[in-house]
Amino acid sequence: MSVTLDLQLASASTDGLPSEAQLQGWLDGTILGFQQEAEVTVRIVDEAESNELNLTYRGKDKPTNVLSFPFEAPPGLELPLLGDLVICRQVVEREAAEQGKPLMAHWAHMVVHGSLHLLGYDHIEDDEAEEMETLERDIMQELGFADPYLNDEE
């Protein structure tokens, strides 16, 4: 059982970023509960790249915390490629500060949240959002972090 991490650092600054070992642990803690083998690219970017990707793929002209790009293999081709996560350093840092959350807890949450999208979970409909948020809470707790939605419910 393993998750292969391909880490790409495309941010001008690497100060305050999680270590490769932390990212690996968060991916393992999320994905191995669903499948035995996977390969995930995590690309940490600045706001300009996040904004460009968010506009191109979601039609939203602003940077966002995490974008998930699931890999869709052609029929009959079995590969462990799960997909790519693109995480914007500045947005994660800003959100953590605004929400009063520890920075590493918010990084972990973005990896968990994005990984669940790669696994096919979504939050467009209310029932889907509830299921996904429950999984996020459970996984974050297993990883040793507080409920990431606690402040949202106050």
From Swiss-Prot:
This is Endoribonuclease YbeY. Keywords: Cytoplasm, Endonuclease, Hydrolase, Metal-binding, Nuclease, Ribosome biogenesis, rRNA processing, Zinc. Zn(2+) binds at residues 113, 117, 123. PROSITE patterns: UPF0054. Belongs to the endoribonuclease YbeY family. Its EC number is 3.1.-.-. InterPro entries: MetalPrtase_cat_dom_sf_prd, YbeY, YbeY_CS. GO terms for biological process: rRNA processing. It is an enzyme of class 3 (hydrolase). Binds 1 zinc ion. The lineage of its organism: Bacteria, Pseudomonadati, Pseudomonadota, Gammaproteobacteria, Aeromonadales. Its main location: cytoplasm. One of its GO terms (molecular function) is RNA endonuclease activity. It comes from the Bacteria. It comes from Aeromonas hydrophila subsp. hydrophila (strain ATCC 7966 / DSM 30187 / BCRC 13018 / CCUG 14551 / JCM 1027 / KCTC 2358 / NCIMB 9240 / NCTC 8049). The gene is ybeY. Single strand-specific metallo-endoribonuclease involved in late-stage 70S ribosome quality control and in maturation of the 3' terminus of the 16S rRNA. It holds the Pfam family YbeY. It is found in: Cytoplasm. Its cofactor is Zn(2+). GO terms for cellular component: cytoplasm.
